[in-house]
């Protein structure tokens, strides 16, 4: 309601495309959806001016930053939105003094912020055109976001871009930037814009009069209400930093431009310098050296797995020999060290079961703890199953003390938990579960 009351006093004169500052009058202030008479130091309110050079967030472009000052007050602009058509609302923090409706003010956009925003938005158009030049006309933008120094663009494409394709897109974009192409904006009718091939976002609604932004004429021609540089060279160098999936048939590229590009370059250089010092090779030999180390690491891990498996299985005989007699059934219930995973533990359980006599019932239940979690596996032989002993039932009996769950078939079952301290109690329940089954089937 407050916005509509302010809108009735007249539309905001939006001059962000042509100016970075303006003298204005405070038309009103809003807090919590209600009109208020004023705001004092430390408070945050929404403020409406009769004229503003501040760009309101839209079209994927972040809002401007800056200050609004007047006789006895200073405001920091932290956000700018257009909640209803024709009304620009500034979210401000009162840095000093007191502001009230009717006061005269001077609105000043942060010049560095705006330059960065223009670089990023024009850079978005350049990347879009480069994608279409490299991939073809089906690579069509479906959304974007840009703020000073950073841009991301979502586009239709069925698969990940190869490293070579990504490099080609980046090269085409930077060639267009270095070509110092003119950037021009003009208003025309929507039918005329479509006739000359201006690209529009699918699903977006447009007025009958639209704004077209061109970079190098027809090379890049899009419907756009954002702020832009005057020549492509002002975008500065551009680096595509990532390319990812954002859904079926949709990809996203992210890039840095201007000052943020140089920050990225410094970080990459520091990374390479660190690698060359650590690996003690020149920069151009880093990939080969890393690959060599990875190959050696994989070989070492493979050998470690082999030795670990041998060590685990070496204990199978001792475990089988330590089986307890529970109602005529040989029961092995133990915790094994080494932090075995489910697969390794299963192999050990089956090995121990194979060492038990097939002429009498046999149950093997082993548990292992690793990284604060519990793995447990149970296996029964055929003789035990004939006595109605089920591995699945035993696993379910073990689960509560270790805060877990499990299940499986009558011959093999497994589970996991999050309370390793409950392992001793869980192993005691194995003997109880077997004894109950054997006595019940007798």
Question: Across the structure, where does each feature detected by a protein language model lie?
Answer:
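A glycine- and charged-residue-rich anion-binding loop/surface
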Residues: 1-442
């Amino acid at each position: 309601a407050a916005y509509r009351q302010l809108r009735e006093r007249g539309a905001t004169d939006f001059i962000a495309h042509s100016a970075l500052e303006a003298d204005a009058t405070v038309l009103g202030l809003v807090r919590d959806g209600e009109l208020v008479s004023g705001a004092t130091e430390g408070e945050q309110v929404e403020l409406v001016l009769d004229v503003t050079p501040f760009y309101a967030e839209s079209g994927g472009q972040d809002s401007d930053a800056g200050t609004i000052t007047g006789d006895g007050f200073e405001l920091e602009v932290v956000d700018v939105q257009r909640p209803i058509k024709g009304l620009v609302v500034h979210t401000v923090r009162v840095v000093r003094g007191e502001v009230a409706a009717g006061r005269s003010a001077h609105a000043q956009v942060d010049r560095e912020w705006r330059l960065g925003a223009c670089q990023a938005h024009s850079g978005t158009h350049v990347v879009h055109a480069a994608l279409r030049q490299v991939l073809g006309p089906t690579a069509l933008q479906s959304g974007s976001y840009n703020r000073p120094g950073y841009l991301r663009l979502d586009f239709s494409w069925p698969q990940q871009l190869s490293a070579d394709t990504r490099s080609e897109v980046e090269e085409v974009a930077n060639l267009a930037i270095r070509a110092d192409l003119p950037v021009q904006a003009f208003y025309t009718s929507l039918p005329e814009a479509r006739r000359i091939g201006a690209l529009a976002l699918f699903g977006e609604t447009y007025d009958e009069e639209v704004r077209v932004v061109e970079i190098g004429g027809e090379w890049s021609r899009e419907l756009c209400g954002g702020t832009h540089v005057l020549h492509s060279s002002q975008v500065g160098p551009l680096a595509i930093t990532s390319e990812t999936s954002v859904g079926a048939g949709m990809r996203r590229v992210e890039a840095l431009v201007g000052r943020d590009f140089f920050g990225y370059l410094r970080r990459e250089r520091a990374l390479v310098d660190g690698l060359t010092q650590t690996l003690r090779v020149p920069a151009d030999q880093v990939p080969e050296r890393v690959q060599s180390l990875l190959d050696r690491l994989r070989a070492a891990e493979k050998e470690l797995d082999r030795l670990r498996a041998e060590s685990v299985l070496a204990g199978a005989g001792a475990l089988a020999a330590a089986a307890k007699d529970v109602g005529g059934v040989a029961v092995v219930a133990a915790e094994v060290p080494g932090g075995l995973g489910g697969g390794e533990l299963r192999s050990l359980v089956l090995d121990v079961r194979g060492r038990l006599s097939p002429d009498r019932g046999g149950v093997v239940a082993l548990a292992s703890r690793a990284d604060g979690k519990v793995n447990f596996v149970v296996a029964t032989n055929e003789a035990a199953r004939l006595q109605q002993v089920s591995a699945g039932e035993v696993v379910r009996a073990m689960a509560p003390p270790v805060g877990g769950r499990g299940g499986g078939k009558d011959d093999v079952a497994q589970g996991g938990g999050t309370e390793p301290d409950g392992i001793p109690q869980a192993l005691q329940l194995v003997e109880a579960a077997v004894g109950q089954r054997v006595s019940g089937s007798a």
